[in-house]
Amino acid sequence: MNKFKGNKVVLIGNGAVGSSYAFSLVNQSIVDELVIIDLDTEKVRGDVMDLKHATPYSPTTVRVKAGEYSDCHDADLVVICAGAAQKPGETRLDLVSKNLKIFKSIVGEVMASKFDGIFLVATNPVDILVYATWKFSGLPKERVIGSGTILDSARFRLLLSEAFDVAPRSVDAQIIGEHGDTELPVWSHANIAGQPLKTLLEQRPEGKAQIEQIFVQTRDAAYDIIQAKGATYYGVAMGLARITEAIFRNEDAVLTVSALLEGEYDEEDVYIGVPAVINRNGIRNVVEIPLNDEEQSKFAHSAKTLKDIMAEAEELK
């Protein structure tokens, strides 16, 4: 860990997601030092200059520079946004083989620097790539985190807040499972401004069809955005910044991230989106929400989908 300086993040991958995350960190002054690594060194040079020019208006000064893998040796957090991008019509799981090869190289380079901090992975398919990062790095599971369903849960809360005309922060509802097509909403524990969703729906019979559509919109949002503008990046960048903030401020915040399960939710040896307590040490523990039978069945299906894909991946054997 970075014992002698302020909080240091090394960002690997300066594409749309990575550069949006970098801007979020600087804009909110979440870090003291940000190092950016990418094969496109000229774009990194330009972004570093641009971000530096923004720092006079950030709450506190953030040091930003272009770097190399050797800069990871004293980093508190290495965030990986590098990898092949998702194309229109392509699922996140289609990206597996391409990105596993990329990650084996990246994680090897990071660990060669004597890195001893926390990994945060955003590249898709995130649940599989964070599992690969854990395997390739040899770090404890607590210090390898995936962005998981943090963005899906944010989309879900936003749409529910609009349906019930309250602020998103007044909605407590989670999307869990794979960050992808098999994810599921935890309807049984959703509440709006402290009122159980089930109770509210009893007062609005027409609302059941509406909330089912809300989940479909949540699940398919990425495809809609990719079709419209080629990629999603602002939402996930803010989600990554939120996880980073929870780590550096030692918040013990509960966020829906991709964490390794070891018996929780009746699953083993799979990274998947679940609520977890996040603090300076990474994942303190997984929060096990009691699911109803339907939710448990869907969660098991989601986990099996990921396990089946990993079983076919030569890089993980």
UniProtKB/Swiss-Prot annotation:
It holds the Pfam family Ldh_1_C. The gene is ldh1. GO terms for biological process: glycolytic process; lactate metabolic process. It is found in: Cytoplasm. GO terms for cellular component: cytoplasm. Catalyzes the conversion of lactate to pyruvate (Potential). Appears to be the primary factor that allows S.aureus growth during nitrosative stress in both aerobically and anaerobically cultured cells. It catalyses: (S)-lactate + NAD(+) = pyruvate + NADH + H(+). Homotetramer. The keyword NAD applies. Its EC number is 1.1.1.27. One of its GO terms (molecular function) is L-lactate dehydrogenase activity. The active site is at residue 179. Belongs to the LDH/MDH superfamily. LDH family. NAD(+) binds at residues 17, 38, 43, 69, 83-84, 105, 122-124, 147. It is an enzyme of class 1 (oxidoreductase). This is L-lactate dehydrogenase 1.
